[in-house]
């Protein structure tokens, strides 16, 4: 069963210092204005979940069906809608229009962060898969950065699916697991997560409690 999480915006990276003077690299996430737009139950939808809106959007950019959906909940239109599967007991504590804040997490807690990685365009195998390049000289005239053989002979006579070749790199959903929350700024509604997370500055991310915590029995 999934847990309730937060939708956020990647502000950027910085570092903080511990009381002992150690430097910790952190990613700053803005998780303000997470508001509940719908509570789904087994009776009405066949499963239990909560739908959350994040950010803001001009009324002229909202479709009529979505505008009606948000008006029913009494919630301002958001930049993004995200659904989290939760148990019935947790859903009973929430209501439409309720704000989900940084108090959902605590310092030291492990979380999973999902985002969209930075797109790199069409890339070769050296950049995309860390292949080694060919020899610069000594008989190598036109095969410095080629991937090499991509198959066998007449049998099987084809390239196997999944062969690592050149192609589009980045711009895909990536989840980084077991990141630690180093600090919480409740006043500015910021989460400072230890380490790097996918995506560019301003990118949308989803933060949820870790599901595979290291060392857990």
UniProtKB/Swiss-Prot annotation:
Domain of life the protein comes from: Bacteria
The UniProt record lists the keyword Magnesium: no
Coiled coil stretches, renumbered: none
Changes after translation: Methylated by PrmB.
Pfam entry (one): Ribosomal_L3
Gene Ontology MF term list: rRNA binding; structural constituent of ribosome
Assigned keywords, A-Z: Methylation, Ribonucleoprotein, Ribosomal protein, RNA-binding, rRNA-binding
Cited PROSITE patterns: RIBOSOMAL_L3 (PS00474)
GO biological process: translation
Protein's UniProt keywords contain Ribosomal protein: yes
Polar residues biased stretches: 134-146
Modified residues (N5-methylglutamine): 154
GO CC terms of this entry: cytosolic large ribosomal subunit
Region Disordered: start-end pairs: 134-154
Family (UniProt): Belongs to the universal ribosomal protein uL3 family.
Role: One of the primary rRNA binding proteins, it binds directly near the 3'-end of the 23S rRNA, where it nucleates assembly of the 50S subunit.
Family annotation (NCBIfam families): L3_bact (TIGR03625)
Self-association state and partner proteins as the record states: Part of the 50S ribosomal subunit. Forms a cluster with proteins L14 and L19.
Name of the protein: Large ribosomal subunit protein uL3
Organism from which the protein derives: Burkholderia lata (strain ATCC 17760 / DSM 23089 / LMG 22485 / NCIMB 9086 / R18194 / 383)
């Amino acid at each position: 069963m999934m847990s309730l999480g937060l939708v956020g915006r990647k502000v950027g990276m910085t570092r903080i210092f511990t009381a002992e003077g150690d430097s910790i690299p952190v990613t700053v996430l803005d998780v303000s204005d997470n508001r509940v737009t719908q509570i789904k139950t087994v009776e009405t939808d066949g499963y239990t979940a909560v739908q959350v809106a994040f950010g803001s959007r001009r009324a002229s950019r909202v479709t009529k069906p979505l505008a009606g959906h948000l008006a029913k909940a009494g919630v301002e239109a958001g930049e993004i809608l995200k659904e989290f599967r939760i148990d019935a007991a947790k859903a009973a504590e929430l209501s439409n229009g309720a704000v989900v804040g940084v108090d959902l997490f605590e310092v030291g807690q492990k979380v999973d962060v999902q985002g969209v990685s930075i797109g790199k365009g069409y890339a070769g195998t050296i950049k995309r898969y860390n292949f080694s390049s060919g020899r610069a000289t000594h008989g190598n005239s036109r095969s410095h950065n080629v991937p090499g053989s991509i198959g066998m002979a007449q049998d099987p006579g084809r390239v196997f699916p999944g062969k690592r070749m050149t192609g589009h790199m980045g711009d895909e959903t990536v989840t980084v697991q077991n990141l630690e929350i180093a600090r919480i700024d409740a006043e500015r509604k910021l989460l400072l997560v230890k380490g790097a997370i996918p995506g560019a500055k301003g990118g949308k991310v989803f933060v949820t409690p870790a599901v595979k915590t290291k060392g857990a029995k």
